[in-house]
Swiss-Prot record:
GO annotation terms (biological process): mRNA catabolic process; RNA processing
Protein name per its UniProtKB record: Polyribonucleotide nucleotidyltransferase
Source lineage: Bacteria, Pseudomonadati, Pseudomonadota, Gammaproteobacteria, Pasteurellales
Domain called KH: residue spans: 552-611
One Pfam family from the record: RNase_PH_C
PROSITE patterns assigned: KH_TYPE_1, S1
Species of the source: Mannheimia succiniciproducens (strain KCTC 0769BP / MBEL55E)
Subunit text: Component of the RNA degradosome, which is a multiprotein complex involved in RNA processing and mRNA degradation.
Family listed: Belongs to the polyribonucleotide nucleotidyltransferase family.
Function per UniProt: Involved in mRNA degradation. Catalyzes the phosphorolysis of single-stranded polyribonucleotides processively in the 3'- to 5'-direction.
Major location (coarse): cytoplasm
Family annotation (HAMAP family): PNPase
Length: 704
């Protein structure tokens, strides 16, 4: 085995690519590492196309092994299970920039598996996996128009930072990942703390320029270790079949694409498609239906794109920069903590907010350590939203990705846990969909959060932009429909407030998208966002002053950290009894901060009084009302404040001589006692004699 190694500096890090030693039966395999974070990436490509294959079967799997961080998995089986949400998102991050680089007509099955085998807690594996996948595909010889580079851009102290460490990311106002070839940006995924459009574009350009180091290094690596390029030629278009499809369908499709209502339009297009297939297969039974459908789809694209470039109205009759009609309702569900319905044309989100306590936080067991997430965002896309039947169950990759994008859009305006001590969960139910449901989720979430009384910094709106480019002509479209997304050259989603951008996601299918085109798209998106925010502010302009009557009230109090053990009790008995008796939830931090949550305010007052009682200090000279807990020959033990027991010696029970304690006291009897002394060991000496004046004494009733 003679491994081939390529090493290069990338910003503040050293990247190493190695091939030839491991997984030699795969089409290509690369061990990619960046400062001790190592990802092993394999590519297997099938030489033959499956019969009847009519789409490109590319699969990307990303998996993290716990041994990479020197840990053993939890749970009963002690091995890794199904991919986590984070793993799914990184798999999508790898997939998105490489998918457009395979030529049209290439239908061979390809599987990319990226496995994290070593992790440095300061270096995120996602970037390493993207670089490794690019290198492995480039080595494999498959018809891949790469390589791509990938860069993470931070924004710290008004400066862009290339590939910031985990520690630096905590100080950064931006987390942007950009991927592209030497000529073009292909993908952007970002979250920002309300930056301007100009700053966001500058970050994209900066990241693309910096990643050229990676692209050049992979090219050199391929020159040394690459396999021969596949002798693959794109299938010749069947001119005769194309002409037949056009003759039958072109005019009818042109009319169908003037129908503004989605369902009616789809029914018409499906009928035309069925007619085309029936007519052509009747003439020639050997013609594949898949081939006819591909030509039909290409014709649809040609018609829609041609009209847009020619300046004609869009599918639903709008101009290029018009946003569809908006309809907003807040407070739509009576018992939830906050809710809103946001409708934009034929896209609709029912957003619901639930407030919980810190114990509702999600604990994420990641390779870099355990952390808590106090803001949860879940996106559901049921089949009825597009008028179809289908499987209902655990979220698919797309739902996870859209939920994370919507969360990124809203995260910048959320209060910290110290400002608003609630765990917040937002669920966006997509009840109708015709383009840009993730951005509808951002708008719906912003409205529902305000309805719930969450003190968000400002309203947030999201908009999806599209682009159609033919040669030197291009048109940027605001608020794209599903068809425009599918048939266009760019999907460009922007979320933000009136003052700046909170999230930007870009997927570009072609080369030649210049920074100037991106700037036009960002400016057009800003105008659309301002329009949507204006309508949203008419519905609800600020967070409600009070949270829902059905939401838990959280009250905080401080106790001496040394007293925490007293409140918890032996084996948690005291705190458990308190929560069960009052129906509250109690959380205690190490610094002595006690958070009590309950829907019933009176229950909270009871708990606070009990905790004050438990943690109260016994004062010498003070008089307390206590209960006799046990009797002894030499005196009686009395529980006073906080269930602290003191001894009333037999000589201190009465003014006269006492022969037998039980003649004067019984267990459970309430008595008034005065604290005579607290010795060094904390033992309390009590008396029932000479209690003094009530004005000078402290009387506390103690409940057992």
């Amino acid at each position: 085995m003679n491994p081939i190694v390529k090493q290069f500096k990338y910003g503040q890090h050293t990247v190493t690519l190695e091939t030839g030693a491991i997984a030699r039966q795969a089409t290509a395999a690369v061990m990619a590492s960046m400062d001790d974070t190592t990802v092993f990436v394999s590519v297997v490509a099938k030489k033959d196309v499956k019969e009847g294959q009519d789409f490109f079967p590319l699969t990307v799997d990303y998996q993290e092994r716990t041994y990479a961080a020197g840990k053993i998995p939890g749970g009963f089986f002690k091995r890794e299970g199904r991919p986590s949400e984070g793993e799914t998102l990184i798999a999508r991050l790898i997939d998105r920039p490489i998918r457009p680089l395979f030529p049209e007509g290439f239908l061979n099955e390809i599987q990319i598996i990226a496995t994290v085998v070593s992790v440095n807690p300061q270096i995120s594996p996602d970037l390493v996996a993207m670089i490794g996948a690019s290198a492995a595909l480039s080595l494999s010889g498959v018809p891949f128009n790469g390589p791509i580079g990938a860069a993470r851009v931070g924004f710290i102290n008004d400066q862009f930072v290339l590939n910031p460490t985990m520690a630096e990311q905590k100080q950064s106002r931006l987390d942007l990942v950009v991927a592209g070839t030497d000529k073009a940006v292909l993908m952007v995924e970002s979250e920002a703390d309300i930056l301007t459009e100009e700053q966001m574009l500058a970050a994209v350009v900066f990241g693309h320029q910096q990643q050229q180091v990676v692209v050049e290094a992979i090219k050199e690596f391929v020159a040394e270790a690459g396999k021969p390029r596949w002798d693959w030629v794109a299938p010749e278009p069947d001119s005769a079949l194309i002409s037949k499809v056009k003759a039958i369908a072109e005019n009818r499709l042109g009319d169908a694409y003037r129908i503004t209502e989605k369902q009616v339009r789809y029914e018409q297009i499906d009928a035309i498609k069925a007619d085309v297939i029936a007519q052509i297969t009747a003439e020639d039974e050997e013609v594949s239906e898949g081939k006819i459908v591909d030509i039909f789809t290409a014709l649809e694209s040609q018609i829609v794109r041609g009209r847009i470039i020619a300046g004609e109205p869009r599918i639903d009759g709008r101009t290029v920069d018009t946003v569809r009609a908006l309809d907003i309702c807040t407070g739509v569900l009576p018992r939830t903590h906050g809710s809103a319905i946001f409708t934009r044309g034929e896209t609709q989100s029912l957003a619901v907010v639930t407030l919980g306590t810190e114990r509702d936080a999600q604990i994420l067991d990641e390779l870099t350590g355990e952390r808590q997430d106090t803001f949860l965002f879940h996106y559901n896309f049921p089949p009825y939203s597009v008028g179809e039947t289908g499987r209902v169950g655990s979220p698919k990759r797309r739902e996870i990705g859209h939920g994370r994008l919507a969360k990124r859009g809203v995260a910048a305006v959320m209060p910290s846990i110290s400002e608003f001590p609630y765990v917040v969960r937002v669920v966006s139910e997509i009840t109708e969909s015709n383009g840009s449901s993730s951005m509808a989720s951002v708008c719906g979430a912003s409205l529902a959060l305000m309805d719930a009384g969450v003190p968000v910094k400002s309203a947030v709106a999201g908009i999806a932009m599209g682009l159609v480019k033919e040669d030197d002509k291009f048109v940027v479209l605001s608020d794209i429909l599903g068809d425009e997304d599918h048939l266009g050259d760019m999907d460009f989603k922007v979320a933000g407030t009136r003052t700046g951008v909170t999230a930007l996601q870009m997927d570009i299918k072609i080369e030649g998208i210049t920074p100037e085109i991106m700037q036009i798209a960002l400016n057009q998106a800003k105008s659309a966002r301002m329009h949507i925010l204006g309508v949203m502010e008419q519905a609800i302009s600020a967070p409600r002053a009070e949270i829902s009557e059905f939401a838990p009230r959280i009250y905080t109090m401080k106790i001496d950290p040394k007293k925490i053990k007293d409140v918890i009790g032996k084996g948690g008995a005291t705190i458990r009894a308190l929560t069960e008796e009052t129906g509250t939830s109690i959380d205690i931090d190490d610094d002595g901060t006690v958070k009590i949550a309950a829907v019933d305010g009176n229950a909270v007052k009871t708990v606070m009084a009990r905790i004050e009682d438990i943690t109260a200090e016994v004062e010498a000279g003070a008089v307390y009302t206590g209960k006799v807990t046990r009797l002894a020959d030499f005196g009686a033990f009395v529980a006073i404040v906080g269930n602290k027991e003191g001894l009333v010696h037999i000589s201190q029970i009465a003014e006269e001589r006492v022969e037998k304690v039980s003649d004067y006291l019984q267990v459970g009897q309430e008595v008034q006692v005065k604290v005579v002394e607290i010795d060094r060991q904390g033992r309390i000496r009590l008396t029932m004699r000479d209690l003094g004046s009530k004005e000078e004494s402290q009387e506390l009733s103690v409940e057992q």
